[in-house]
UniProtKB/Swiss-Prot annotation:
Gene name of the record: HSP90AB1
Bias (Acidic residues): 225-244
Region Interaction with BIRC2, annotated ranges: 1-214
Sequence motif: TPR repeat-binding, positions: 720-724
GO biological process: negative regulation of proteasomal ubiquitin-dependent protein catabolic process; positive regulation of transforming growth factor beta receptor signaling pathway; regulation of cell cycle
Name assigned to this protein: Heat shock protein HSP 90-beta
Sequence positions bearing N6-malonyllysine: K399
Main location: cytoplasm
Database matches in PANTHER family: HEAT SHOCK PROTEIN 90 FAMILY MEMBER
Residue positions where Phosphothreonine is found in the record: T297, T479
Carbohydrate-modified residues: S434, S452
Species lineage: Eukaryota, Metazoa, Chordata, Craniata, Vertebrata
Organism: Pongo abelii
Amino acid sequence: MPEEVHHGEEEVETFAFQAEIAQLMSLIINTFYSNKEIFLRELISNASDALDKIRYESLTDPSKLDSGKELKIDIIPNPQERTLTLVDTGIGMTKADLINNLGTIAKSGTKAFMEALQAGADISMIGQFGVGFYSAYLVAEKVVVITKHNDDEQYAWESSAGGSFTVRADHGEPIGRGTKVILHLKEDQTEYLEERRVKEVVKKHSQFIGYPITLYLEKEREKEISDDEAEEEKGEKEEEDKDDEEKPKIEDVGSDEEDDSGKDKKKKTKKIKEKYIDQEELNKTKPIWTRNPDDITQEEYGEFYKSLTNDWEDHLAVKHFSVEGQLEFRALLFIPRRAPFDLFENKKKKNNIKLYVRRVFIMDSCDELIPEYLNFIRGVVDSEDLPLNISREMLQQSKILKVIRKNIVKKCLELFSELAEDKENYKKFYEAFSKNLKLGIHEDSTNRRRLSELLRYHTSQSGDEMTSLSEYVSRMKETQKSIYYITGESKEQVANSAFVERVRKRGFEVVYMTEPIDEYCVQQLKEFDGKSLVSVTKEGLELPEDEEEKKKMEESKAKFENLCKLMKEILDKKVEEVTISNRLVSSPCCIVTSTYGWTANMERIMKAQALRDNSTMGYMMAKKHLEINPDHPIVETLRQKAEADKNDKAVKDLVVLLFETALLSSGFSLEDPQTHSNRIYRMIKLGLGIDEDEVAAEEPSAAVPDEIPPLEGDEDASRMEEVD
């Protein structure tokens, strides 16, 4: 609960900062940062946002601006008081806003930003996490915020960052509407009161803000007045308080006298020095997107990108274009160098593309302007055709916006293709945003082909470099009809998988897909450049064969037919069928899935979903096929034992052990890992020559049962010793 202190009639309430905010402020105050200047960028950016909000509200209700028509930002240094003041005529804050926004409710980015800072991130990232206001404490020992919202009285917020802040009704000079932030600067930060320094920082970070930023400075100038006026002013000056700085200082700096012989004898004049307030607009640059791209330097694009996004790094690529004809709009699109920390967070406020109508800012969170998978693109769209007072509901129905969106997507894909020609930069882009491209393939059927050309993967022949599907196709053998791929958790895991043995041995290249989103991507990407994509982990893998190989395969099928039937009987519903494999070389067996079922990797991903649909799990997971390698000695010996006695318990035990091991090596998980472990331990004992009966006699009280229950529930113990 806030403490209340009464000063006469004035009520001051004291609140404690929310714990994470207090921690952040402590970090800002007690750590040395070299680029403290970013505080000014953050405060100007906040002022600009407040102005955007009131202007947007005024589009539907012009009376909102009755409390002040002019939308502007003023910067007022006061060296005598050691204060730097920023005033905006934005929407202002109510008392509740003031308490919530400046201290008692932590933004989602507070903790994330502190973690980033402690991991070595730059302080200038603060704006991206939504806590830019607190950067004021980089230079200020005390901050006072005076604010007036149309729906509330004028209030003052004050804090010296000691873990608490105060809020009171403010009866000082009325500000009409908006917010005034007064920074009481630290003794060593007075450089931010100098004209040169303020101009430098505003030019560097905020020259493209869409509202006039005016610097108010007290300056001196010489003024020429007649001798009589000078005497009068001098007399007045002496009568008044010497410290009054509003009146001009009078200095005799020379006089002009005319010759007495002149016809019109002029009065004597004197020059005096007077103090005045100079107003200078610091951001007269017109919106960069309205200019000709040929006249804009890369540095200007970089500065605009930083002021637009609060990023501390330059952009990776830029696309500046205009569309004319039936529809007219201009756009400026940027690709950042890195993905933001909350790129795929559902609840995050989207502010990637700012929508303007005829240079008037409308909104910065327009979902209809760009598809979800391009949510990392930053920039500006300025339409000539949309109405100024357009609402969100109207935007959803707007045909104009649909055409703009289509053009933006087209230009983004052009930009990606241009970037792909620069291998180094494309590698950075792909590391940051490959998931977005794959999400696009899943969601955007219209542009699926163009997006697929941008994909890059490691393959069995690409070494450390990634390769495109186009390059893969160019290397395909004459007899090869399909693009072979495998999905899994890591490059090492899939490269050593049993599934790729035969394919690689035959000299065919295999694409390694190791991100969870690849599973969704290939479900939609059925083919590329006329070549179908075939998973080497699914049934029906057809490799080009000559007549001799076909004949050998038919012989193997006939030879192992009885073993396949027996294994199917033993495993029953665990597998759909047991067949001879054409994909194995050194492994005895593997588990493949049906053509339309999930792969082992997809099953793992789906099991990890907290909100999964169990009804889907049932029919998508069920179809497993066991493939055995007819050339492997284990399988051949098992065939001989089965033919000698198909009721041999050891055969049953071995079949299940082979199946469970194949499940693991194929990427699946076991339903009952304990029973499998016990079987393995028993084999280890046999291998070491340990007699189970002796062990059981020595440990009569052991909690573990003396014998592992046989596989089929038979009461007789399994005779695995015979196999050993």
